[in-house]
């Protein structure tokens, strides 16, 4: 009989403890957000939508080197190289299939010109899969993104039209690598 009384006391204690816990949660700060009205906090290094940036001169930064497409583990990036009259490469078309993209950031790390950057934008839901395939016009933004002063062609030392490399003002002569061989 004492066993039954002990079970009743134990059950009553369990019920009271549960009621106190439920009552206490009514006065706590809620964990859920009323999303679109309340914006979600995203950490600074959040990897969201991919964009193509421009250099400080307003030209496309992408040189169509194809490193981003090679680095992509799911193969969602495709592009075709074209060349301007002065020898500068640019992508004739640049396409990202966001229905396959896993937002790993490997394309951003592989890009030598910092043309590809991941933004904290994550609202890309759509009803049709073909609407998740973004072309170059959809990806290009007007600004330089995270690196505002970087210009690949200034750093890489591209030849000026009509002058060989090393002939510009304050520019060192190019090194002949074959002369360094034994």
UniProtKB/Swiss-Prot annotation:
HAMAP family in the record: NDH1_NuoI (MF_01351)
Keyword NAD: yes
Chief location of this protein within or outside the cell: membrane
Gene behind the chain: nuoI
Cofactor(s) for this UniProt protein: [4Fe-4S] cluster
Binding positions ([4Fe-4S] cluster 2): 72, 101, 104, 107
Record protein name field: NADH-quinone oxidoreductase subunit I
Topology within the bilayer: Peripheral membrane protein
Taxonomic lineage of the native organism: Bacteria, Pseudomonadati, Pseudomonadota, Gammaproteobacteria, Pseudomonadales
